[in-house]
Amino acid sequence: MEPPDAPAQARGAPRLLLLAVLLAAHPDAQAEVRLSVPPLVEVMRGKSVILDCTPTGTHDHYMLEWFLTDRSGARPRLASAEMQGSELQVTMHDTRGRSPPYQLDSQGRLVLAEAQVGDERDYVCVVRAGAAGTAEATARLNVFAKPEATEVSPNKGTLSVMEDSAQEIATCNSRNGNPAPKITWYRNGQRLEVPVEMNPEGYMTSRTVREASGLLSLTSTLYLRLRKDDRDASFHCAAHYSLPEGRHGRLDSPTFHLTLHYPTEHVQFWVGSPSTPAGWVREGDTVQLLCRGDGSPSPEYTLFRLQDEQEEVLNVNLEGNLTLEGVTRGQSGTYGCRVEDYDAADDVQLSKTLELRVAYLDPLELSEGKVLSLPLNSSAVVNCSVHGLPTPALRWTKDSTPLGDGPMLSLSSITFDSNGTYVCEASLPTVPVLSRTQNFTLLVQGSPELKTAEIEPKADGSWREGDEVTLICSARGHPDPKLSWSQLGGSPAEPIPGRQGWVSSSLTLKVTSALSRDGISCEASNPHGNKRHVFHFGTVSPQTSQAGVAVMAVAVSVGLLLLVVAVFYCVRRKGGPCCRQRREKGAPPPGEPGLSHSGSEQPEQTGLLMGGASGGARGGSGGFGDEC
């Protein structure tokens, strides 16, 4: 069995199907229109920005419009575009006086050149697609501007730490930014956490101003209750600003210091340069007494001298300095300084004293004069006296060699080596830069002391006649001795370098037999006596003529050589005309032998030796060639 309404349902189904077919066949039956619009767009001031509005899907015909939402809520239309076929027809309606004006590009996007703070609005894109419906989307435009350099104006007055409430410290300015920057304060690089509500310890106030350009300027004023520790503190402020994409920046101001007023708590009083660690100053120096209190600003100082428990005021100034030109021993004593600070606490000691001690050293006095003459081998005592404060120390030296400490110098069994300059030096151990000296010259009177020497000496018996020798005599004494030689030619006496008091003379001569017999004497003399020395040479050998011996040896050698040559020549030419002629002239009578005795050979040899030398003289053609 069918339900009662079955026929009605059966009859309605074909109608619904037909309606669906008709709607599907209608050209305006399309999907719902949707838009792609970025909800937030960020840009830096002065840069260009493009707001995108893209319909999704395919629509042959639609109308795109851009609206601006102003502060009153009104929505003036800026531009529109109509899609006809494949092209978009653009129409600008209201530029709102913007320069450069708004523009639509070929894709229906809204273009804002050189973005300004006034462009920071909501921009609405509306697309009407007929039967597909109408879509609307909003893009929020934020324009960012970096503020100018942060400026700070500190309080240039004198701020008292005795105030029990916060005082104005400085004002910080950050101008022409967007959005409005934030200002923070710093002391010695550490951020100050100060509230914005007024309280005695510190707070800050802020004020934001919109400039004619639409940019924002922020002013912050800092108030603090100051302490004495803030006298050396450095303060500054910083502006924190925002940038696109969630970034941030910071601009710090220059640092500054405050001028504070605080009472004196401690006073110092001392002797300035020059002074020694023990507190002494030298007589004649320029001395400064320095007084300093730790209050600010600098208080007034009263400098005085105590004499018989009475104050003698010497100077009153704001520097706390007292200068004593060319200080003398009479200025030794007690000096004082008082700080005139009426804001100081009752238990603070505002007065200080010190003891000025002037060191002095008078010229030294010797018991002897500048020159002391003493006989050889005698003794003497010299005293050195001095007055000074603190007690001086005395020391004796000679040629920088220490001799002893104390005022007395004892000289005993003096010799010529004792001659020289003796120095008494006085010094103050606690004042190293203060010292004096006094000296005297010791002259030892006595007969001369003599020393002799030979240059290249030889042992006894090694001298030969004609050998050259240099003799040297050296002497010392006082008065200076004179040097003389027993022969002429001695050099003048001259001081010996590096040997104080010694003079020297030299004599160069040739050794002879007479010198060997008599010797050479050198004598040193002065009014106290003389000393004499004789140089002896021992046995002197006669000089052999080496040249004559050499000539004789050569002559003998040449003669023997000529004799051998002559004999050899005659043997080779035996029987020749020359030999026969010689035999005719000098042959013995017949029957006598050629050599009758041993002595008959010598004349012939002599003749042979002489023939070579005399034959040429006799005939001009002689020589060994004419005689055998």
Swiss-Prot record:
The modification Phosphoserine is found at residues 596, 598, 600, 621. Residues 1-31 form the signal peptide. Residues 32-142, 147-257 form the Ig-like V-type domain. It comes from the Eukaryota. Epinephrine-stimulated phosphorylation of Ser-621 by PKA enhances adhesion to laminin. Ser-621 can also be phosphorylated by AKT1. GO terms for cellular component: collagen-containing extracellular matrix; external side of plasma membrane; extracellular exosome; extracellular region; plasma membrane. Residues 609-628 have a biased composition (Gly residues). Pfam families: C2-set_2, Ig_2, Ig_3, V-set. GO terms for molecular function: laminin binding; laminin receptor activity; transmembrane signaling receptor activity. The keyword Glycoprotein applies. PROSITE patterns: IG_LIKE (PS50835). It is a single-pass type I membrane protein. Wide tissue distribution (highest in the pancreas and very low in brain). Closely associated with the basal layer of cells in epithelia and the endothelium of blood vessel walls. One of its GO terms (biological process) is angiogenesis. Residues 274-355, 363-441, 448-541 form the Ig-like C2-type domain. Keywords: Blood group antigen, Cell adhesion, Cell membrane, Disulfide bond, Glycoprotein, Immunoglobulin domain, Membrane, Phosphoprotein, Receptor, Repeat, Signal, Transmembrane, Transmembrane helix. Glycans are attached at residues 321, 377, 383, 419, 439. Disulfide bonds join 53-125, 172-237, 291-337, 384-424, 473-522. Homodimer. Interacts with ITGA4:ITGB1. Interacts with spectrins SPTA1 and SPTB1. This is Basal cell adhesion molecule. It comes from Homo sapiens. The gene is BCAM.
